């Protein structure tokens, strides 16, 4: 079996004990990615110099008897919209290919390195994070490690697929409308969209400032928690899982699931005792508002470059950005009003519950040659509707953890949603699900 053989926490423990050299592990990981990534296209650039530099620092601290950090020696991937010192941040586009290299690391990258993690590679993404599929006209498409003829999801697809393929144990992504949750579900790994504003976006290329959020992917619930603690530079308090009140989202989130997804969500709900059903109002309008805000703010980020470099954009992304620039201000204003209204309704939904459960997607990963899927008895765009269940929740800015449910066949993910700032509750439940055998990352 190729790739990393230990999961995040075990790997870090082995490095801290001196059982494994961080440098040797890094050299092997770099060689493994170079040999195997042709099958999946997760990585756009290897960070050989930075990786070896970080690994040698970790080994030096271990030899000196000092603590190298909770993620000592653990390789991590970085979505190519985070600044890495000495590298050009492309955000998945040729448009930025001639920009000057970053002079310092993004805040989250710096936090990861400070925790002992090894920056191993920049990962593929949809151009400027505008998509759910990691279909990229410039750097190629990322393929799902579980079925290379299928989508890995996006826009953080390279970060998710790289974890699933054991190329790195953890990775950084961003999530505006589902860009962590969708690929985590399709690739069968753990992912977290943090509470909006909780993790720094400094040094990351923006897409939709009103909605942009960042977060980690990992090969285990414990690894995801350790990564999050490193990113926010603080330890989370323990939570009594038995005291958590869990309910299931119904209505919009209870419709249109494939039979395997329906069965998986029903099974998980039963195991959690989530008998209460909560229905959010105006979910379809919330999703529409997310589309409007994304299109308008995304366009605003690119108008200047579109005037001079329009031909360098992926035509599909360029068309969406140009359409967003033409949206009337009254529509944008209404979308933001609905955003605030929907956030209030989300807060009300937690009056009698601590965690809400919902499917992450309608079903399994679509094939590349499958432009449409059936939803509600109609054939609709497969790629645009990957965010059917993730996009409405975007408006509220609440934390959402994606759970890789233990199911036969291709991976399926569930969303666990908590109040803002209560990632501790999400991690407590995630670790219990993993311990109880109800959830597990699917690595190849």
Ranges and model annotations:
Residues 71-94, 292-343, 347, 368, ...:
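Short helix-loop capping/hinge segments that flank enzyme active sites or metal/cofactor-binding pockets
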Residues 63-74, 238-246, 353, 357:
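Flexible, low-complexity linker/loop segments at domain and module junctions
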Residues 71-211, 360-378:
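Short glycine/serine-rich loop/turn segments
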Residues 1-52, 270, 442-444:
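An N-terminal boundary/leader segment
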Residues 22-27, 56-59, 259-279, 303-308, ...:
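Acyltransferase
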Residues 73, 213, 230-292, 314-317, ...:
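Gly/Ser-rich, acidic/histidine-flanked active-site/gating loops
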Residues 18, 29, 73, 114, ...:
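Glycine-rich, small-residue loops and helix-cap segments
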Residues 35, 114, 164-252, 266-267, ...:
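Structural helix-boundary/capping segments
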């Amino acid at each position: 079996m190729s790739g990393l053989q230990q999961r995040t926490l075990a790997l870090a423990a082995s490095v801290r004990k001196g059982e494994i050299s961080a440098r040797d592990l890094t050299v092997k990981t770099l060689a493994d990615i170079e040999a195997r990534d042709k099958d999946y296209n997760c990585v756009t650039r290897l960070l050989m110099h930075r990786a070896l530099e970080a690994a040698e620092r970790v080994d030096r601290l271990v030899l000196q008897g000092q603590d190298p950090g909770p993620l000592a020696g653990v390789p991590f991937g970085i979505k190519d919209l985070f600044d890495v010192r000495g590298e050009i941040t492309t955000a998945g586009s040729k448009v930025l290919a001639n920009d000057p290299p970053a002079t310092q690391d993004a805040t989250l990258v710096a936090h990861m390195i400070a925790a002992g993690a090894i920056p191993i590679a920049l990962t593929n993404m949809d151009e400027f994070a505008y998509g759910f599929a990691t279909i990229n006209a410039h750097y190629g498409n990322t393929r799902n490690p579980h079925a290379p003829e299928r989508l890995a999801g996006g826009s953080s697809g390279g970060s998710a697929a790289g974890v699933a393929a054991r190329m790195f144990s953890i990775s950084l992504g961003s999530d505006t409308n589902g860009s962590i949750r969708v690929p985590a579900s399709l690739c069968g790994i753990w992912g977290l969209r943090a509470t909006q504003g909780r993790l720094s976006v400094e040094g990351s290329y923006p897409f939709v400032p009103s909605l942009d959020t960042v977060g980690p992917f990992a090969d285990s619930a414990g690894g995801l928690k350790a990564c999050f603690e490193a990113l926010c530079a603080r330890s989370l308090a323990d939570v009594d899982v038995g005291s958590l009140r869990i309910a299931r989202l119904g209505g919009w989130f209870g419709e249109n699931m494939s039979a395997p997804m329906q069965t998986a969500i029903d099974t998980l709900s039963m195991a959690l005792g989530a008998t209460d059903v909560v229905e959010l109002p105006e979910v379809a309008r919330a999703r529409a508002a997310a589309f409007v805000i994304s299109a308008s703010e995304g366009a605003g980020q690119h108008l200047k470059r579109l005037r001079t470099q329009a031909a360098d954009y992926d035509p599909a992304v360029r068309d969406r950005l140009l359409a967003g620039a033409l949206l009337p201000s009254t529509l944008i204003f209404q979308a933001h009003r609905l955003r605030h209204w929907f956030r209030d309704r989300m807060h009300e939904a937690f009056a009698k519950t601590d965690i809400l459960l919902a499917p992450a997607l309608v079903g399994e990963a679509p094939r590349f040659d499958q432009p449409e899927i059936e939803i509600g008895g109609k054939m609709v765009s497969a790629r645009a509707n990957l965010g059917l269940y993730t996009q409405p929740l975007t408006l509220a800015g609440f934390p959402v953890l994606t759970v890789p449910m233990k199911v036969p066949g291709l991976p399926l993910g569930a969303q666990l949603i908590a109040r803002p700032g209560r990632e501790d509750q999400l991690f407590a439940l995630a670790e219990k699900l993993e311990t109880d055998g109800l959830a597990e990352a699917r690595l190849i």
